[in-house]
């Protein structure tokens, strides 16, 4: 009996020790809704705009901009996750009180790299005076812990007089670190080698695209080939992303080649994250859909994440928009959810269900408008497998929601007010709200543009009959 008790006690102690020493739970595959403003594990808006990611142990740490309402610098925030979906807020790692020159400033595109020789985490960023963009400086901060408070080292123009705006950083396999920045009023992209401690510029090693007018660089290496992904310089507005390649970081580099659609699916490059697991390494495009481009601020921005693919060793593709992206950090796989988008055409008016003014804001009431193939008239009928569908807008990534007096677009939550059934009525369909049982209806059977779309007692009238167009 005593021997059995001793064995049981040993097993309990071993289990307790294992629990104490265990790391974070193994991440499971996660599905992320694209083109939305993410939230952290406390339900707060996640502000890591223009940011970058570093992996430390089992955690991915995401750093980015958290700004004031006037877009001036407030914080650089740090979050961590094992699965790239569930992000825990860790710290405001850099604040206005970190240095006097940060009291009124713009701090943009913070990137953190780790120096194995010094044991320090080094943050590089773009710094301006908070009034205009005349300073064009790089800035540096350091910390002994990845998510601790960073000590600000100051700001400067590289090598004394080179302008420095949008930046990124990269640590090569030999431990050499580089900083890339938009220079010469954004007409050049400079590639700088950093000093051994990563806190200063050692030398300018390449200026491959003189006069190219590119910004928002992201640099990564795949199978011995360097890829530089950039955007054109059009302020907050999205534009055509392009990439170039080289087998040496100092060049020669190729000319730029288009990737993605003409607006990078309404986003701008922030970072490219390698995700390595048991099945290999995949590459995640991380972009910002800037709030300033649709009447908001930086903190209203949405995140656009897409898988990058590589048809050859020196080519890259971002060929499709996916409303959802599934990431398995354990396997190292990233896949997009393919979706067919349809218009929803009212029989009585031959007009389309439309998000007015291509708005990306929640709470916007849906109306009808002349069909024009805009993304604000395209809807993904996401089959929930329960006899109901969510209707997600292609342009906004928001879901059609029934309210007491109108139908609006809102953050997709899975609520029953966002679930709809389809009933065939001849060659048309009735779209019925799950909560009320009422049908999607053009108010007053109007044929005019901007007439409200509501829900109303199902009658089978032509203003409740719809076709799903291409």
Locations of regions flagged by a protein language model:
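Lectin-like carbohydrate-binding module/patch detector with strong preference for beta-trefoil
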Residues: 336-470
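Secretory targeting and sorting signals
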Residues: 1-27
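A short linear-motif detector with a strong N-terminal bias
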Residues: 5, 31-33, 40-42, 170-172, ...
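Carbohydrate-active catalytic/glycan-binding domains of CAZyme proteins
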Residues: 27-341
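Short loop/turn segments at connectors of secondary-structure elements within structured domains
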Residues: 21, 72, 117, 134, ...
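Generic detector of low-complexity/intrinsically disordered segments
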Residues: 10-11, 17, 21, 86, ...
């Amino acid at each position: 009996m005593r021997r059995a008790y001793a064995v049981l006690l040993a097993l309990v102690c071993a289990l307790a020790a294992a629990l104490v020493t265990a790391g974070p739970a193994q991440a499971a595959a996660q599905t992320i809704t694209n083109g939305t403003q993410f939230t952290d594990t406390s339900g707060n808006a996640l502000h890591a705009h223009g940011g970058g990611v570093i992996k430390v142990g089992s955690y991915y740490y995401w750093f980015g901009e958290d700004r004031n309402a006037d877009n001036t610098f407030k914080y650089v925030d740090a979050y961590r996750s094992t699965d790239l979906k569930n992000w825990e807020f860790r710290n405001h790692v850099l604040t206005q009180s970190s240095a006097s020159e940060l009291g009124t400033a713009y701090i943009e595109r913070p990137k953190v790299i780790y120096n194995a020789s010094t044991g320090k985490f080094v943050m590089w960023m773009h710094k301006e005076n908070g009034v205009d963009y005349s300073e064009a400086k790089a800035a540096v901060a350091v910390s002994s812990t990845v998510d601790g408070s960073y000590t600000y080292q100051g700001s400067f123009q590289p090598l004394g007089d080179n302008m420095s705006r949008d930046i990124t950083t990269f640590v090569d396999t030999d431990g050499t670190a580089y900083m890339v920045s938009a220079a010469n009023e954004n007409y050049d992209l400079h590639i700088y080698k950093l000093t051994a401690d990563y806190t200063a510029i050692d030398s300018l090693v390449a200026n491959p695209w003189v006069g190219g007018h590119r910004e928002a660089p992201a640099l990564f290496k795949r199978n011995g080939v360097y890829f530089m992904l950039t955007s054109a310089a059009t302020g907050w507005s999205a534009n055509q992303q392009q990439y170039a390649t080289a087998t040496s970081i100092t060049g020669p580099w190729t000319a730029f080649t288009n990737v993605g659609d003409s607006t990078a699916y309404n986003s701008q490059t922030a970072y490219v994250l390698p995700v390595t697991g048991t099945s290999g390494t995949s590459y995640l495009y991380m972009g910002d859909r800037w709030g300033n481009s649709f009447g908001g601020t930086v903190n209203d921005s949405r995140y656009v994440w897409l898988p990058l693919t590589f048809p050859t060793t020196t080519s890259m593709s971002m060929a499709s928009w996916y409303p959802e992206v599934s990431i398995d950090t354990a396997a190292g796989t990233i896949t997009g959810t393919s979706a067919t988008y349809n218009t929803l055409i009212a029989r009585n008016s031959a007009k389309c269900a439309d998000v007015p003014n291509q708005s990306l804001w929640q709470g916007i009431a849906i109306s009808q408008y002349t069909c024009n193939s805009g993304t604000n008239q395209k809807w993904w009928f996401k089959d929930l497998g329960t006899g109901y569908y969510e209707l997600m807008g292609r342009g906004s990534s928001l879901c059609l929601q029934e309210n007491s007096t109108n139908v609006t677009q809102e953050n997709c939550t899975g609520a029953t007010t966002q679930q709809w059934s389809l009933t065939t009525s001849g060659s048309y369909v009735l779209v019925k709200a799950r909560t009320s049982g009422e049908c999607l209806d053009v108010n007053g059977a109007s044929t005019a543009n901007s007439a409200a779309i509501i829900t109303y007692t199902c009658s089978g009238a032509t203003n409740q009959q719809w076709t799903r167009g291409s």
